[in-house]
């Protein structure tokens, strides 16, 4: 099997599901190409069941490098430290509960190698609940760089767990800033502002695990305030004009503080359009 110069970067913490982690790791190690290294960051102490899954893959795959942190520090800080450990400039992100399609790494890596002036490549995702063959919706994102820049004014322009990026470009803007949430959205905004070029492949390269908790954690007063803080920074950066700032504050804040059942219906409606 061909081996590619890519570092896979993922984090796991104690509330992750061991069965889901196993599926995620299995999808990484059954790609059509082999990643040069897989860095798994243990964000604080884990459950015995999670440790068992990790040990079973360590014994089979020497490319798997496990780094344990004694305390849970959150995804952003953990990923920043993990980036420092990646030995390749091209880094593929992965979450501990999602499943890569078998051609994901090969497709993204070949695209980046053919387009040296681009820094970030992503794709669509197939959302599922229990069975990945039963896709409930597809999260589509725009393909071309100019369209991605415009889209980013209103919504996150890439699906984070599908992303493959150049480490140097991420570190040039300071990596994930943990004081702003969602950290990935704010990272993409700063990279776009810094002139980094993005592209989204117009096909699904990952199965994204969806549950009611997916929508629940993206709401509430705290999340709403975090989004407003990002919008304020976007305005100060000159990324959005004042009228879009005002419009976005009203729409996003109202949406985030809606009762969960209403927000759930709205989420389903958006995914169907």
Residue ranges of model-derived segments:
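Catalytic beta-strand/loop signature of glycosyltransferases that borders the donor
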Residues: 124, 198-205
